[in-house]
């Protein structure tokens, strides 16, 4: 005699549903473009569906240094915000970023989480001209902060 199929199937919610994320990347090192490419490659380990904007040359904000190269990156991750921030900080270190270099105004790699699902981070950065210029190149459809 065969067992009859269960009368109901209970499914658990998918707790690993991907989160939409956006990060700002920047470097003022002579090899900034190569470092940005390296950071994107490293981030592909924990962020999928990566979309990268063009990379712009910008003037430094808040430090005396040479120009920066900046871009935005969007994608999806199963990491929560705190896990993602930790992974981004490790990516910065893997790109050579060190506190001692930052004290000398050399930023090998700076990665700021700007968006995790609907939560905005670094809200003061959203008004920066390069972020406003690059936002239309992303798949993010949020209105700018007012």
Description of each model-found segment:
Residues 73:
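Short basic (Lys/Arg) and small-residue
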Residues 45-49, 94-97:
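A structural signal for alpha-helix termini and helix-coil/disorder junctions
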Residues 2-46, 53-59:
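N-terminal beta1-alpha1 ligand-phosphate binding loop
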Residues 7-8, 30, 60-69, 77-146:
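Flexible, gly/pro- and Lys/Arg-enriched active-site loops
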């Amino acid at each position: 005699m065969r067992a009859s199929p269960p009368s109901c199937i209970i499914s658990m919610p998918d707790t690993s549903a991907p989160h939409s994320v956006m990060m700002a990347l920047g470097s003022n090192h002579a090899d900034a473009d190569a470092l940005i490419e390296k950071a994107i490659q490293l981030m592909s380990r924990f962020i999928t569906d990566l979309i990268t904007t063009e990379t712009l040359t910008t003037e430094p904000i808040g430090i005396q240094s040479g120009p920066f190269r900046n871009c935005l990156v969007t994608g999806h991750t199963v990491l929560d915000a705190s896990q993602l921030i930790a992974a981004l900080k490790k990516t910065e270190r893997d790109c050579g970023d060190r506190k001692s270099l930052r004290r000398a105004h050399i930023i090998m790699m700076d990665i700021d989480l700007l968006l995790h699902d609907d939560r905005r981070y670094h809200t003061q950065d959203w008004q920066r001209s390069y972020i406003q210029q690059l936002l239309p190149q992303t798949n993010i459809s949020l209105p700018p902060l007012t």
